[in-house]
């Protein structure tokens, strides 16, 4: 129903007078001021308004239309999600039978590093490009103090922030009277396990090529993260700084390739994008399909070699490796499809119930008989 309010020609609400001999005056002739709002449609709350009237003729079709739209969309998303290949290995080593159990109690400074190997079998081939992720559980990257513990100016290559990091980085701002680069708790806790994948055929191990470039967002790689400005090599540019406390080597030694070293190292950039939930995964490597005639990872036996550097047992965390393909909607996530199907089904069911009620009671006389 449309309800229109039109401003009528009315008095402005101010006291009459102001001319000679008319109206109240104060102190010799000024008009008495008033706090009453002006007589306008806006200030007097007379703007046009529209209010829908909910009838069976409008509500029932809306329920059925929503149901008929949401259910097919949900089925399509759910089927697409189920077609994504995914394989997950938990290599925390909590179980005594796990090959990585010997590495469970490693610390940040454990030398030599602990290594373990987990053999597994892929029942189905992975046809398209494969994405390798590492996953952590019970790790709260969304903690307020943790999220703030970084210096974006330093990470963007500002030379003054390099030698004088933000106080938000405390207690990982300086070490031994030298500024830490990169500073903060996020950088200090960077994931540093090394994962290697091998295909086993006829007792022969063949290394799977893992691509380490292209795993970070373009805007992060080219805009948010920059190395310090200067013409020298990274060792000279980072002179006067020290590495994070838990790192085994400084930031300018993260990679041998200049375009993937320092603050623009893609493993580092991926880690610095904090997760919203305590159980998360981050992209580690890419496995590209080399031939349209051969699957990227064919069904068969594989082994995962792990250099176990990252301690999680102290906070009851878990670590895992995930191999996954993707689709137009991203990675495997059945929740979205289930949500669409559920909402569509509820709307369709309510439409049927309300249609029955309307058919049974809609034509009854609603006027009340008042006895004499």
UniProtKB/Swiss-Prot annotation:
<keyword id="KW-1015">Disulfide bond</keyword>
<dbReference type="GO" id="GO:0005886">
    <property type="term" value="C:plasma membrane"/>
</dbReference>
<feature type="glycosylation site" description="N-linked (GlcNAc...) asparagine">
    <location>
        <position position="202"/>
    </location>
</feature>
<feature type="glycosylation site" description="N-linked (GlcNAc...) asparagine">
    <location>
        <position position="105"/>
    </location>
</feature>
<dbReference type="GO" id="GO:0030658">
    <property type="term" value="C:transport vesicle membrane"/>
</dbReference>
<keyword id="KW-0812">Transmembrane</keyword>
<dbReference type="GO" id="GO:1990531">
    <property type="term" value="C:phospholipid-translocating ATPase complex"/>
</dbReference>
<keyword id="KW-1003">Cell membrane</keyword>
<comment type="function">
    <text>Accessory component of a P4-ATPase flippase complex which catalyzes the hydrolysis of ATP coupled to the transport of aminophospholipids from the outer to the inner leaflet of various membranes and ensures the maintenance of asymmetric distribution of phospholipids. Phospholipid translocation also seems to be implicated in vesicle formation and in uptake of lipid signaling molecules. The beta subunit may assist in binding of the phospholipid substrate. Required for the proper folding, assembly and ER to Golgi exit of the ATP8A2:TMEM30A flippase complex.</text>
</comment>
<keyword id="KW-0472">Membrane</keyword>
<feature type="glycosylation site" description="N-linked (GlcNAc...) asparagine">
    <location>
        <position position="233"/>
    </location>
</feature>
<feature type="topological domain" description="Cytoplasmic">
    <location>
        <begin position="358"/>
        <end position="372"/>
    </location>
</feature>
<keyword id="KW-0333">Golgi apparatus</keyword>
<dbReference type="Pfam" id="PF03381">
    <property type="entry name" value="CDC50"/>
</dbReference>
<keyword id="KW-0325">Glycoprotein</keyword>
<keyword id="KW-0813">Transport</keyword>
<keyword id="KW-0445">Lipid transport</keyword>
<feature type="transmembrane region" description="Helical">
    <location>
        <begin position="337"/>
        <end position="357"/>
    </location>
</feature>
<dbReference type="GO" id="GO:0045332">
    <property type="term" value="P:phospholipid translocation"/>
</dbReference>
<dbReference type="GO" id="GO:0001917">
    <property type="term" value="C:photoreceptor inner segment"/>
</dbReference>
<dbReference type="GO" id="GO:0005794">
    <property type="term" value="C:Golgi apparatus"/>
</dbReference>
<dbReference type="GO" id="GO:0016324">
    <property type="term" value="C:apical plasma membrane"/>
</dbReference>
<feature type="compositionally biased region" description="Gly residues">
    <location>
        <begin position="15"/>
        <end position="31"/>
    </location>
</feature>
<feature type="glycosylation site" description="N-linked (GlcNAc...) asparagine">
    <location>
        <position position="159"/>
    </location>
</feature>
<keyword id="KW-0966">Cell projection</keyword>
<feature type="disulfide bond">
    <location>
        <begin position="103"/>
        <end position="114"/>
    </location>
</feature>
<feature type="glycosylation site" description="N-linked (GlcNAc...) asparagine">
    <location>
        <position position="119"/>
    </location>
</feature>
<feature type="topological domain" description="Cytoplasmic">
    <location>
        <begin position="1"/>
        <end position="58"/>
    </location>
</feature>
<keyword id="KW-0968">Cytoplasmic vesicle</keyword>
<feature type="disulfide bond">
    <location>
        <begin position="169"/>
        <end position="183"/>
    </location>
</feature>
<comment type="subunit">
    <text>Component of various P4-ATPase flippase complexes which consists of a catalytic alpha subunit and an accessory beta subunit.</text>
</comment>
<feature type="glycosylation site" description="N-linked (GlcNAc...) asparagine">
    <location>
        <position position="305"/>
    </location>
</feature>
<keyword id="KW-1133">Transmembrane helix</keyword>
<feature type="glycosylation site" description="N-linked (GlcNAc...) asparagine">
    <location>
        <position position="192"/>
    </location>
</feature>
<feature type="region of interest" description="Disordered">
    <location>
        <begin position="1"/>
        <end position="36"/>
    </location>
</feature>
<dbReference type="InterPro" id="IPR005045">
    <property type="entry name" value="CDC50/LEM3_fam"/>
</dbReference>
<comment type="similarity">
    <text>Belongs to the CDC50/LEM3 family.</text>
</comment>
<feature type="disulfide bond">
    <location>
        <begin position="100"/>
        <end position="116"/>
    </location>
</feature>
<dbReference type="GO" id="GO:0001750">
    <property type="term" value="C:photoreceptor outer segment"/>
</dbReference>
<feature type="transmembrane region" description="Helical">
    <location>
        <begin position="59"/>
        <end position="79"/>
    </location>
</feature>
<dbReference type="GO" id="GO:0005783">
    <property type="term" value="C:endoplasmic reticulum"/>
</dbReference>
<feature type="topological domain" description="Exoplasmic loop">
    <location>
        <begin position="80"/>
        <end position="336"/>
    </location>
</feature>
